[in-house]
Amino acid sequence: GADDSDWRKKGAVNVIXKDQGQ
């Protein structure tokens, strides 16, 4: 989503959250 670059910076934990739509 639009936050892809942001979650990539934060790390793998946020990748999981992103996959859940967070």
Curated annotation (Swiss-Prot):
Signal peptide: none
S-adenosyl-L-methionine listed as a keyword: no
Annotated region (Disordered), positions in chain: 1-22
Entry keyword set: Hydrolase, Protease, Thiol protease
Any GO molecular function: cysteine-type peptidase activity
Gene Ontology terms describing biological process: proteolysis
Recorded superkingdom: Eukaryota
EC number: 3.4.22.-
Similarity comment text for this entry: Belongs to the peptidase C1 family.
Protein name per UniProt: Cysteine proteinase
